[in-house]
């Protein structure tokens, strides 16, 4: 559990401190993001017997592949950002200082694994997600559902 929290703190810190253009984060954020994904993969492996973890691990793995293949940043489709109504985020990504994400270009590898699926209003939190994100969402749902059913049976 502690490693999941550490990975979340690293990723949140990258977004928060990167947005403030902290040089250390801008220079080493890629490595920190990759490290956070390695932590999540380790936790998934360690807990592989729990229902839903394999889907979570697959989602993390797919996101990890596209991030590593694209210089340590998750590519995002510009058209999907507009469809989701995330116009301000487009401007942020065009600046090129956002540590964890970048816009898809002609050089982007594994585009089909990138953040290309818009979740627009009326979705409560408009965003753009990847296939890996959906697998993780479903895996977490399955994990929670299984835990609730086990508790109910005891």
Task: Annotate each predicted stretch with a short phrase.
Residues 1-37:
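Transmembrane alpha-helical insertion/packing segments
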Residues 8, 60, 112, 127-130, ...:
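Hydrophobic transmembrane-helix microenvironments that flank and shape a buried ionizable site
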Residues 14-20, 41-47, 141:
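Hydrophobic alpha-helical transmembrane segments
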Residues 28-35, 126-138:
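Membrane-interface loop-to-helix entry segments
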Residues 39-68:
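Interfacial segments of alpha-helical transmembrane regions
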Residues 62-86:
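Transmembrane alpha-helix/helix-exit interface in multi-pass inner-membrane proteins
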Residues 78-128:
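Extracytosolic (periplasmic/ER-lumenal) interhelical loops and adjacent juxtamembrane/interface segments
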Residues 146-154:
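Membrane-interface capping segments at transmembrane-helix boundaries
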């Amino acid at each position: 559990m502690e490693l999941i929290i550490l990975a979340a703190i690293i990723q949140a810190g990258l977004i928060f401190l990167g947005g403030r253009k902290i040089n250390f984060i801008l220079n080493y954020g890629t490595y920190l993001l990759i490290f956070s994904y390695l932590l999540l993969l380790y936790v998934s492996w360690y807990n592989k017997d729990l229902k839903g973890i394999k889907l979570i691990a697959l989602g993390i793995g797919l996101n990890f592949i596209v991030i590593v293949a694209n210089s340590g940043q998750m590519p995002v489709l510009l058209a999907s950002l507009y469809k989701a109504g995330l116009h301000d985020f487009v401007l942020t990504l065009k600046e090129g200082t956002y540590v964890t994400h970048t816009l898809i270009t002609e050089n982007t590898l594994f585009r089909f694994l990138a953040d290309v699926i818009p979740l627009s209003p009326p979705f409560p939190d408009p965003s753009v997600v990847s296939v890996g994100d959906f697998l993780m969402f479903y895996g977490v749902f399955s994990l929670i559902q299984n835990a609730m059913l086990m508790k109910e049976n005891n």
